[in-house]
Amino acid sequence: MAERQATIASSSGLHARPAKLFVQAVQEKGVPVTIAVDGGSDLNAGSILSLMGLGASHGTVVTLKAEGDGAEQALDELVALLETDLDAD
């Protein structure tokens, strides 16, 4: 199982717009991905409701996990997305 940590860069955390963009990216990867905050349960990263319930604000460190073909590359790309301010236009 591949695992990566990322720091949420979006200025408002994983609220509606960044969460939507992240969920779309997860679903495009074709591998199951989970996300968790320190000490929390692994949640489905492909679910907007799970992401919104995570309560990840700017600067929160999250752990992503994935399994299967392409998991390493998928996580690298997802970490890069989370570490980009998705609120900046």
Predicted segments, located by residue:
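C-terminal structural segments of small proteins and small subunits
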Residues: 53-89
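Compact, glycine-rich, soluble single-domain proteins
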Residues: 9-58
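Short amphipathic
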Residues: 1-10
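Long, contiguous binding/interaction regions
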Residues: 3, 24, 89
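Beta-strand secondary-structure signal
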Residues: 5, 32, 61-65
